[in-house]
Amino acid sequence: MSLPLPESFVASMRQMLGDDAERLFVALDTEPVVSIRLNPYKSAKVFDGEAIGWSKWGRYLAERPQFTLDPMMHGGAYYVQEASSQFVGYLLKDDSLESKRVLDMCAAPGGKTTIYSTLVGREGLVVANDINHSRTLALADNVQRWGLGNVVVTCNEPSHIGAFEHWFDIVAVDAPCSGEGMFRKMEEARTEWTPSSVDVCVARQKEILAEAWRTLRPGGKLLYSTCTFNDREDEGVVKWLMEEYGDNLEAVERVELDDRWGIVRGDIGAFQCFHFYPHRVQGEGFFVAVARKRDDSIRRVVPKSRRKVFAQLQNKDVAEVSHWVDTPKQMTFKLIGDMVYGYDNAVVDDIVHLSESLSVVYSGVAMGQIFKGKLKPEHPLALFVGCNDSVVPTVEVSLDDALDYLRRQDISASQFEEGINIVSYGGVAIGFIKRIGARCNNMYPKDLRIIKL
C-alpha cells in the first residue's frame, strides 16, 4: 500500500513491540490473506483450501475470486471472513451452546453473528445488535443468507439492551475501535486514524462493556474483541474490566494454542488475552479476551413490554404455512403486519419479549404473505435450512442462468415447472422463481440484485 502508516502509530508500536514492530510494518504493506468460513448446514462443495487451524470451517484461499459472481455465496454456503476474527468460535468450541442465548452487541456486518448462529443451532438464539440502522440492514441480509432462523437483529443503544439483565449465556462485544488491524486491507483506515480517535474509542468501549456486563448471566462468558493493536484499547480496557468487575470474574478453562499458529497470549487477571499480528499469523490484526462471570444466584430480569408486535394466524393459515418447513411441530408462526414469520418453539417466547421491548429489524424466518389462502413465499424462506424443498420443485441451473437470476434478468422458463420453483446452484438454494406459461417472474429481491458482472 502506497499510503504511509501514521507516524504516531509507528512510534507507539515501536514502544510497545520493540524490534518486532519493524516486522509488523512490513507485513502491513503486503497483500492481505484471503479466507472464508463454510456453512456446515449447507453441504455445498466449495473451496477446498488450506484449513484455518483455529476454525473448524475456515479455509484459506490462494487468491481472491470475484465473490460477487459466485451464486453459492449469495445462497449462504459460506461467509467471506478474515481468519483472525474466526477465533471467537474457537474460544467457545468446548461449550455446549445448543439452545443457549448469545448477545452480539456490536454485530454488523454479521461475520461473528453467523459463527454464534452456527454454534447455538436452530433451537438457540442470537441477538445481533448494531446502533446504525443502515448497518443492521446489511446484517439482516447476511443472517438471512446463513439461513438458520435463530437470530434477532436489533438496532438499539447498548443501554436499551442492558435492561435485559442476566439474560445471556454468552455476551460478545466486538467493540468499535481505531481500526489499526485494518491498515493492510483499507487505505481509509490509515487516513482516518489519529491519536485522539483512540481516546474516543476507549471511552465508548467502556460504556458498551458496562451495559454488556449487565446482560451476562452468572456463569456466562464475556468476550471482548477489537481489530486494533494498541494496548490502550486492548489490554488497557481489560485492566479496566478487572478494576470494575474483578470480584465477579473468574478464568475460563485454559485455552490451548498450537505454537505454529503464531498467536500471542498475554493474560490479565481472570482474562485470557490473545493478540493476532499479521507478521505472525495468517490473518489480520485482532485482539480478543475472555473470562467468566462468577456463578452467583441472580434472577433474570425481563423488561416490561412496551407494545404488542405479533398477531396470531388463523388455524387454516397455520396449516398452509406449516407444510413449507421440515419440522412444523417444532415451529410457531406469527404475524407482523401481513408478513408471516417462523420461530423455533424453544425461543419464540424470548423473541416475543425482545420484540416488545427493543427495536427489532429482523427476526426468525420471514416466510411470506397469505394471499387467497396460499403462502406467497418470501426470499429468506428459500435460504432457510429448514425449508421443506419437497413443497415446490427445486431446479439446478447453470452458472450463466444463476447469475442472470441474481441480476433479476429473464432466464429460460422451459427448465421450470408451472408455478413457484426454488432456483438452486451447486446444490444451494438461491431464491424463488415463478413460471407462468412461457415466461418466468423473477422473485429475487430488487435491493439484493447484482448490478454489474
PLM segments and residue spans:
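C-terminal catalytic and target-recognition region of SAM-dependent MTase-like enzymes
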Residues: 228-342, 347-348, 431
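Conserved class I S-adenosyl-L-methionine
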Residues: 98-108
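S-adenosyl-L-methionine
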Residues: 129-166
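Conserved SAM-binding loop of SAM-dependent methyltransferases across substrates and taxa
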Residues: 109-122
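Helix-to-beta-strand junctions that scaffold the AdoMet/dcAdoMet cofactor pocket
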Residues: 120-121, 216-218
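Polybasic, low-complexity RNA-engagement segments
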Residues: 1-43, 294-453
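Mobile active-site "lid"/loop adjacent to the S-adenosyl-L-methionine
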Residues: 134, 169-210, 227-235, 256, ...
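A short acidic, Gly/Pro-enriched loop at the edge of an enzyme's catalytic core
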Residues: 97-100, 160-172
